[in-house]
């Protein structure tokens, strides 16, 4: 089984305020630009690396501060510490909470959960946090367990076919 690599984009505010994450097809402008337009107000300054996928955002109303990472003696984590901190926290959370067992088809849900938790990490009102979680769950259509885990048959049906049940 081959797993296609998945790119994750994040956006942060100064001092790491709120973040946004999304699974994208690749790191091309066709994939990056819609994410930026959905999550960042025009007129904002984007701090990016020198990747060409970000080219053209200036024509869409964004200023761009570029930090070229390739060929620099400093580590990327020193040049863009907030982005690397978020990436590290996400990796640690996925490995610790889910023991690394993250299926690509469920990655967007994991990113949503991580983003929800991160953006509310300093919430002083746990009741409001619960209220927001309930609001989001009520606004989403239900899914069966079989749909969630990506199986077409239930475990019982599979066990019966194998002769275990």
Question: What is each of the regions a protein language model found here?
Answer:
Residues 1-165:
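Residue-level recognition of single "structural anchor" positions
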């Amino acid at each position: 089984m081959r797993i296609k690599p998945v790119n994750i984009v994040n956006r942060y505010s100064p001092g790491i305020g709120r973040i946004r994450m999304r699974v994208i097809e690749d790191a091309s402008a066709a994939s990056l630009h819609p994410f930026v337009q959905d999550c960042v107000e025009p007129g904002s300054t984007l701090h990016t690396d020198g990747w060409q996928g970000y080219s053209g955002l200036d024509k869409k109303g964004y200023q761009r501060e570029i930090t070229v990472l390739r060929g620099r003696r400093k580590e990327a984590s020193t040049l863009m510490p907030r982005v690397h901190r978020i990436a590290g926290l996400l990796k640690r959370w996925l490995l610790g909470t889910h023991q690394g067992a993250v299926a690509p088809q469920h990655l967007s849900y994991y990113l949503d959960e991580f983003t929800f938790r991160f953006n509310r990490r300093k919430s002083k009102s746990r009741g409001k946090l619960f209220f927001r979680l309930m609001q989001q769950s009520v606004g989403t259509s239900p899914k069966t367990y079989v749909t969630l885990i990506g199986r077409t048959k239930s475990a019982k049906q599979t066990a019966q076919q194998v002769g275990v049940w």
